[in-house]
Each structure stands twice: as C-alpha cells, then as structure tokens.
Amino acid sequence: MNALDVYDGLTERRTRFLRVDELCRLAVQAGHLPDPAADAGRPLKEKKHLELAQGAFLAEILGDPDCGTHLCHSMLLPRKESLELQKSFEKSGNAEFPGASLRREGKAAVLTMSNPGFLNAEDETTLAGMETAVDVALLDPATEVCVLRGGAVTHPKHAGRRLFGAGINLTHLYQGKIRYLWYLIRDLGFVNKFYRGLAKEVVSPEVDSIEKLWIAAVDGFAIGGHCQILLTMDYTIAAKDAYLTLPARKEGIVPGAADLRLPRFVGDRIARQAVMAERRIACDSAEGRMICDEVDSPEKIDAAILRTVEKLTGSGVVSAASNRRAFRAGQEPLDMFRRYMAVYAREQAHCHFSPALISNLEKNWKVK
C-alpha cells in the first residue's frame, strides 16, 4: 500500500476534505487498512495492535508536504455539527456538550471543561464535544475573546473544587476505551484550533482563518494534556497554589505537541526535565511564570479573568488574528507542525501499544 496514492484517491487528488477518522474508515472499507473493530471492547493489554497500521499510514501522509498539509487543513475546518449548533448558540448564548459547556458572558465566550468524576480528564466521551465547543466559540459573531477553564469535580479527593484538568483518562486508557486515533483527532483538531483558529476551505490556514484570543484560567492543576493546552493559549492566569506537570514518561506516551512547544516557554533543559523526569512546575515559580502570565490567589481568579477580558478587548481586537499569525510564522509555521505530527503519529502508535505502557499504568497509576 502506498499511503500517498490512497490519500489522493480517497480525497480525489486533495479536492475533498476528510477528517482523520473518516479517512481511516474509508481506507478500511477499501481494504487498505485492517479493521480495528475486532479489537473493540478489549482491554488495552489484550488488543491485537491492529491500529498500528493506522499509525504508519498517517505518518506517511503527514510526512508528505502536499498530503500532510491538506490533512492538517482538513482537521482545522469546523465540524459539521458545529455549523448547525452555532446558530442556536448565537441566539441563546448557552450550549451544553459532552465534556464541555459554553456560555457567553459579555464580550467573552467561556468554555468550561467538564468530566467531574475523573478530575476533568480527557477521553472518548469528551473529545467531540470539546472540539465542537471550540468551533462554536470561534464562530460566534458576538464573542470577541474566549476563556477556557475547568469545572467543579465530584471525585472524592477534590469534591466541589474547580480544577483545570488531569490530562488523559488513564482508567479508560487501560480499559481499552481510548483508541489510537484519539490522539491524532485531539492534537490535529481542537488543540490545534486553539493555536491556529478555524480554517476556511478555499484558502490556506496560513493565509486566512477565523481566530480569537484565548485566555486560560488554571485552578488546582493542569496535568498532562491540560498542560499541553496551555502552550496554545494567548494569556494564562493561574492560582498561586496551582501546578503543572507532564508525566509522559511515567505514563509511557508522547505528550501531544508539548515536545515541540514547551521549549519555547521554558527552554530545552527544563522542558526535558518536565517530560523525561516528571519535573513538577509550580505556577507561582520562576519557571511557572514563563508559562503563566498572571498568578493570583485562588479567590481572585474570577476577577482576574474579567480584568484580562477587558484588557484584551478594551481597544478592540482587530489586530488579534494578524498578530497570532505573525507569531506563528516565526515560531511554528504549519509545515513545522506537520513534520512534527508525522513523527508523533508513528511514535505514539508504538507507545500506545507498548507493553511498557501497560506496565506503567499498573505500577505507577494502579489503574484497573
């Protein structure tokens, strides 16, 4: 199988946009990939690794400048569901999604991440809802700036407390409830939309896109994937008692695009310590303030959000998208991201099915 020929065939020589999951589904139907349905319902340790072929397939596509850029463009387009829901949100200013809620408050759309029984962890139950919420916030004409924060949780250890998020749901991962494609849909999808906005079909996302500034407010902690998200934000507020970690080594996976983005904030040495040696970064430390723009006492976070919204919108937001594009041109153009994701697609597939991942989950996290 030549993945590039398959991609050109399924996308009609790159004139048709297909999301990662739809692309792989059609490739399975055409006999180019094994059907991962045979592994559905099995715990991770019992899977037959049928999804490894998806990793090799997507790595080859993303490694090609033409096909890879087209796939990145596809994943930056709004979901079909988002275009339908945007109109109702425009009228009501409120929307509920699996794993997230969206509320317009003055000039801001406030997106609250919610998976209360799992410390707001990310999994298959939150993925589509989260991306749809991001789309709707960016599409809303009455919104000038977006705010991202975690909701209150019900987990016994932190019941009633607002938390930013605990990263990937390790229990679901161990139980085999998170597929390999979850990583690619997430990082090519809503996480990249935080950073690049929404693409338009008729023009490169490098040239034109639908963008708004994003403000994050960190209560408690931002672990793993939630720390990765902070690296895409335009402004981050954190509580003084909050902390950040990227326990990728202890989990046994690649931490999204953090290996690409974190060194820009804290330098190579600290980034490697965070990823390879589980360095915990207090938000109120010198290193934490390289990621967090403002650190305040927990009871003052709400006021800090309001103040920041006014600060970023007080003179209008006409240049916000232009400045975001200019920063990206110097820091992370789409082609750099594409090349990183080609490596990520291949390496994460091997990590996801590694016996070491199972061992780490059982030993370090005691999941069942």
Q: Which positions does each model-derived feature cover?
A:
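Short, aliphatic-rich beta-strand segments
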Residues: E105-N115
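Crotonase-fold acyl-CoA enzyme core
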Residues: S204-V317
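C-terminal alpha-helix plus adjacent terminal tail
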Residues: M1-G106, V153, A282-C283, A303, ...
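A structural preference for short, pocket-lining loop segments at secondary-structure junctions
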Residues: L111-T112, G129-E211, I215, Y235, ...
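Extended acidic/polar regulatory tracts at the flanks of large eukaryotic scaffold/adaptor proteins
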Residues: F118-L119
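Hydrophobic/aromatic residues within transmembrane alpha-helices
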Residues: L111, L148, N169, I229-L230, ...
